[in-house]
């Protein structure tokens, strides 16, 4: 599903994760992330409490935004997220976080995101229509749905 351009952008830039529950959106920037060989997106869970609550309330529905600030190339990836608390991905994030925060924090788990739709957000590019449930949440705040 993810072509090489999308994977490259995901590996080289920070992401924004968007979730929504009860009409209230939540967006968080993430730097502790990776793309697996099979095209799944993984995010270290350090401070994702609201994100996890929203995912539990919406069957794991999530959107990930990534873009290059210089070229304006960008993508939105929509899919389903699963929270895992053990395994090699979690161990990798735990080591990374403990080193980064010098033992003051640790990863509680990881989100494993299975992409379902990729939308080009690069200015001037053609794109797909909005997902109704996610846009309903955004429209409640009078925000534009791409």
Residue ranges and their predicted role:
Residues 1-146:
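Binding-site signature for planar aromatic cofactors or substrates
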């Amino acid at each position: 599903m993810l072509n090489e351009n999308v994977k490259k952008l995901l590996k080289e830039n920070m992401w924004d994760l968007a979730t929504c529950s009860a009409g209230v959106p939540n967006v968080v920037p993430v730097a502790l992330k990776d793309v697996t060989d099979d095209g799944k997106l993984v995010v270290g869970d350090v401070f994702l409490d609201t994100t996890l609550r929203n995912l539990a309330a919406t069957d794991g529905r999530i959107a990930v935004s990534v873009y290059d600030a210089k070229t304006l190339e960008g993508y939105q990836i929509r899919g389903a997220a699963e929270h895992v608390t053990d395994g090699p991905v979690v161990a990798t994030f735990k080591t990374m976080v403990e080193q980064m925060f010098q033992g003051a924090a640790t990863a509680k788990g990881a989100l494993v995101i299975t992409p379902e739709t990729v939308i080009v957000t690069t200015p001037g590019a053609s794109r797909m229509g909005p997902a109704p449930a996610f846009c309903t949440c955004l429209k409640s705040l009078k925000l534009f749905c791409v």
